[in-house]
Amino acid sequence: MTAAVQSPVLPLLEKENVADIAIPEGDSTYWWRTSGQDLSRMLQEAGYPDEAKRQFLNYFRDTICPTLGGKPDSNALRTAVGWDGSPFEYSFEFKESTKSAGVRFVVDLTQLRPGDKSAPLTTKTTENVIESLSKKTPLFDDNWHRALSQWFVYSHAPESEQKALVAAAGYQTNIIMGFDINAKILDLAPGYLPIMAKSYFPPCFVAEAKGFTRWQALSLGIRQIPDIGSHPNILLALKLIEDYVAAKPELAGGARGLSTDFVKAGKARLKIYMRYLGDDFEEVWDYYTLGGKIPDLESDKEMFRDLMTLSSPSTYTEEDWKDTQVDPRRRAAFKTKPTAVYFSLSPDKPYPIPKVYFYPARAAPNDKVIARGLDAWLTKYNWHDGGKSVEERVESVFTHRKLEENPGIFTFIGLGRKEDSTKKGLSLQVYMTPELYVTPRF
């Protein structure tokens, strides 16, 4: 259906050739030469079909890269995604019931390089990408996205108010976009891109503007969706979370975001993202289960306990630290990254589907020991497919430094039940950031 479908498969760039290419300052090809190639290698490592790779990478190069502006420099405004300010975070998804890996990523498309000084909360660049998705992705529907935008986004506020909100929040991000690259779409909906998209909204601006807590901003953001009353299971699931937070009011400040899918109401989910400052596993587990109110989770408990050890300093030895270059800036940034919990609300369940995200870089000496810990976990629970390890895959994807040098590539490690009510089992998401602000590469 699109011209991109007819173009040849986009090749991986050889490392030695990339190093010889002069990237003009401000040229959007920078993003193709960095994140484009990272994602290309991820799709290769995950075994995606050539046609799915070609269609996605064409779209990424031709639509997403030009939106991102110039190469980051010392004056570049930070995004709300990567720990270093990078606009990208990628993930491999592994499932208990299947041996194939999936590839996802989120990107902050906010106009930051350069920024819009008179309208710092503009969403024009993000909306341009959403408009392109409306024509190229199957079952596209943005009604819930629009409803949430009216609540969370302050791009139409007066300039003085926008600047005050940015000063209070510490960043300019109204919306973050998420992409699930799904090759099955090529068979189920020929002619469309192999992409399912979602949008994420931080609560900070509406909380600041209206005097709410961040948790109130999220909860009320759901309740103000015009047709939400037609989906009683979503409201029942939300009430379980509201009751838990009401009993533990210290959790309200940990509200981090709300997302929805670009599909019609009745199929779309709403996902609530929370941070949790504690390190006690039993407390984390109580949060994950909402005090035991979410059914059928107890049998998974030891798998979560084992995964959480990757975030514990006691897990690592002097031998693990021997090759690490200690970077105080990184260590300070990682100390601010607590455990996270998300709750997915869907129209077909009266309770949320939860997931816990651990942040092993808070304690781990470097990325190599995190990768090996993940591989040991996958092997212990018989998830490893006998092919490449996580360590080998990640080393193939990220070529800008060695994993043993520092932590920072691995970010959150998420584990939780699948959301599809017809399927059982757990899914593991391994999040990674390309470190493009601290390591621009070119």
UniProtKB/Swiss-Prot annotation:
Q: Which UniProt keywords apply?
A: Transferase
InterPro entries (alphabetical)? Aro_prenylTrfase (IPR033964), Aro_prenylTrfase_DMATS (IPR017795)
CDD domains reported for this sequence:
PT-DMATS_CymD
Pathway stated in the Swiss-Prot or TrEMBL entry: Secondary metabolite biosynthesis; terpenoid biosynthesis
What top-tier enzyme class does this entry carry?
A: transferase
Does this UniProt record's set of keywords contain Transferase? yes
Q: What is its EC number?
A: 2.5.1.-
* Superkingdom of the organism of origin: Eukaryota
Function, as annotated, reads:
Prenyltransferase; part of the gene cluster that mediates the biosynthesis of the phthalide-terpenoid hybrid 11'-O-desmethylfendlerol. Within the pathway, mfmD is responsible for farnesylation of the cyclopolic acid intermediate via an O-prenylation reaction. The biosynthesis of 11'-O-desmethylfendlerol begins with the NR-PKS mfmB that forms 3,5-dimethylorsellinic acid (DMOA), which is then transformed into the phthalide 5,7-dihydroxy-4-(hydroxymethyl)-6-methylphthalide by the cytochrome P450 monooxygenase mfmA and the hydrolase mfmC.
Note on domains (UniProt): Residue Gly-257 plays key roles in substrate selection of farnesyl diphosphate (FPP) for farnesylation of cyclopolic acid.
- PANTHER family reported in the protein's UniProt record: INDOLE PRENYLTRANSFERASE TDIB-RELATED, PRENYLTRANSFERASE ASQH1-RELATED
| Similarity section | Belongs to the tryptophan dimethylallyltransferase family.
Q: Write the protein's name.
A: DMATS-type prenyltransferase mfmD
Gene coding for it? mfmD
